[in-house]
UniProtKB/Swiss-Prot annotation:
PANTHER family: MITOCHONDRIAL RIBOSOMAL PROTEIN L24 (PTHR12903). HAMAP family: Ribosomal_uL24_B (MF_01326_B). Part of the 50S ribosomal subunit. GO terms for molecular function: rRNA binding; structural constituent of ribosome. It comes from Shewanella sp. (strain ANA-3). Belongs to the universal ribosomal protein uL24 family. The gene is rplX. The keyword Ribonucleoprotein applies. One of two assembly initiator proteins, it binds directly to the 5'-end of the 23S rRNA, where it nucleates assembly of the 50S subunit. One of the proteins that surrounds the polypeptide exit tunnel on the outside of the subunit. This is Large ribosomal subunit protein uL24. InterPro entries: KOW, Rib_uL2_dom2, Ribosomal_uL24, Ribosomal_uL24_KOW, Translation_prot_SH3-like_sf.
């Protein structure tokens, strides 16, 4: 099944503590979750690892967010949108449902 949201897509957060924020998708996990740049930041207590040169302390990092809690951003309308699929020239492409423009 093709992914409606992919890496480097710009998304809007629909629910949670970062609701309304816009950011790019850094990673898509196979569990149906996404890691979005600067969204859902959590503080992780990191042990020092001198072999890898990692300092210890409290580190802020992005936690995964459920894919259903984000929507792809449509730059033409400036709003959140839904994605559909269609075939053009024998290739499967993604398009925005509101205005039928192709997702870049």
């Amino acid at each position: 099944m093709a992914a409606k949201i992919r890496r480097q897509d710009e998304v809007i957060v629909l629910a949670g503590k970062d609701k309304g924020k816009r950011a790019k998708v850094a990673q898509v996990l196979p569990t149906g979750k996404l890691i979005v740049e600067g969204i859902n930041l959590v503080k992780k207590h990191q042990k020092p690892n001198p072999q890898l040169g990692v300092a210890g302390g409290i580190v802020e990092k992005e936690a995964p967010i459920q894919a259903s809690n984000v929507a792809i951003f449509n730059p033409v309308t400036g709003k959140a949108d839904r994605v559909g699929f269609r075939f053009e020239d024998g290739k499967k492409v993604r398009f925005f449902k509101s205005n039928s423009e192709l997702v870049k």
